[in-house]
Amino acid sequence: MGRLTCYATAAALIACAAITASANAHEVYVSNEKDNTISVIDANKLAVVRTFEVGMRPRGITFSPDQKHFYVCASDSDAVQVFDAATDKWLYNLPSGEDPEQFAVSPDGKLLFIANEDNAVTTVVDLQTRKVVSQIDVGIEPEGMAISPDNKFAVTTSETTNMAHLIDTETFKVVDNIPVDQRPRHAEFTSDSRYLWVSSEIGGTVSIINMETRKVERKITFDIPGLTEDVIQPVGMRLTKDDKTAFIALGPANRVAVVDMETLKVKKYILVGQRVWHLAFTPGEKMLFTTNGVSNDVTAIDVATLRPVKSITVGRYPWGVALKRIQ
């Protein structure tokens, strides 16, 4: 092969690698509850690349389906803040109700469902008009919030009432109240919308609810040698898109449980930072990021090997986490 051909081939390979890296580039946005900031991590470099200020006590964070905006629950500011995803600049606040903690954007990007912990309601905001279209009475201390992929139901979990409240997304009416174990924190639907997973922090379980019968069909429990039951506290969860594997944050147990979604058996416990709270995949599900509130860091986990790759220092009390694609 001639020298010019070699150079051309090398240049093509470099260009291809650059395109691939760009296509797979993501940034991890982490809300720091005590610092009132967002830390942004380069998902390839696994390093914080910038930090910026937001409202008071930021917790829930998510991106719009089109990735043009991101939303932050500034709980002590009683606001959901809207930012430009390209510049990280604050745009405006949405009328969120008191103490917004978690929220979920409808799959069509039109509505935002917000759990208001202090006044026991779910607030629904039209994202185009920026107006409240409904406030729905739910149980005491609502926290978890999810919307089914088919956009038929929203669910709010109430920590003190110990229920998952199913809400019809067209009528904004509660259509069922499903009892679960003590202090339900987080909810996730399977990709086919047939099952709802709810984590119970104090109960130490994850309930799997059949959406057809609206009853708890099975439960997952956890057993970690050397740890007492009271420190094993399921909170944030993520389910793979193929509905084969669940990753469950276990709070002060400092571990993420990896669960086979068919057998509901724990395949592995991954040791991470202290008081692991919420989780987020990269879009291709190759990496999983965990927020560790007490150790003030984020753990990056290789999903293929189920091993932690790096611990990344962020702000104080990291809480929520969301992924942004870089165009």
Where would I find each of the regions flagged by the language model?
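Predominantly soluble domains enriched in secretory-pathway, periplasmic, or organellar proteins
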Residues: 4, 12-327
